[in-house]
């Protein structure tokens, strides 16, 4: 028998929201639960309840050891539900990732049908007309609230902790960039959503390595949901089918060497001679330039093509813009779970402690040799020099 997930479909009031406030903790965005439920249902492309696949339909690949069955590998063609049943035993995490998947498919539709004028791209959210990035923000907060497993959440648009009403013990905290690249929606470039999931009730004093999952929603010619679950090998791509379901279409476990580069913040080459030298190397060695100005597609291509490097370097006059919590750390987990490497110039971005919600950093993602070149060119040495491929430093 199918079991409904507590996400959008039940209309049950979430646990009471704390009224306590601090400088970093505020109450959630003011939603009327019943009306927001209706708005979300009407905003969805399909409006169907999410369902867990019957156990009899799960296609787990198993290996027997001492009489016990252990899932060792997922299968291409699985549904998102089937994959998550293998990827993690945590029902709460499965519910959260399913709810976020529902929000992503709705955002994809809203981005695709947005009206773009001279200053913004807008679409409807119930009776409101909102810029698509704010609409995405609201949808994601609602998804987390209705998951009933999210304690705190914050976003680039609302960079303060929002109490989602979930439990501390066994619950999660989520940070997200609702629509990375929103300024290029009107040009019809690919844009996307980024989010990271941490256990418990903290989004500061933690590292990217503490994440239990991270994901991107990618809205381009295809709509995909790319996710990584800590402890489960690979980074996995799900395609949104016409009937509104997510189907597993790709597993990436290795980022190989290949001449493809995506250089962000090139204005930093003006007064960062080392970065200028690195860019000159790519040009001299005839690397293929693949850069859109959207971080989601520029990093996603490394996972899909299984090669290349993305850089966003700072200088005295071109300061860091990328946020560690909302963008850099989640993408770091996606890249490293896929067999790649990340760096701030000295160490993996997953090893950087998030002190403030707005912490920013430079970053590079790519294959091992590309990250070695990045670190050596900018700082003269690399921690990865003697690290075997497949081992995270």
UniProtKB/Swiss-Prot annotation:
Mg(2+) 2 binds at residues 156, 177, 179. One of its GO terms (biological process) is reductive pentose-phosphate cycle. Disulfide bonds join 116-121. Mg(2+) 3 binds at residues 177, 180, 327. It is an enzyme of class 3 (hydrolase). Expressed in all tissues examined except root. Highest levels found in leaves and flowers. Keywords: Calvin cycle, Carbohydrate metabolism, Chloroplast, Disulfide bond, Hydrolase, Magnesium, Metal-binding, Plastid, Transit peptide. Its cofactor is Mg(2+). PROSITE patterns: FBPASE. It catalyses: D-sedoheptulose 1,7-bisphosphate + H2O = D-sedoheptulose 7-phosphate + phosphate. Belongs to the FBPase class 1 family. This is Sedoheptulose-1,7-bisphosphatase, chloroplastic.
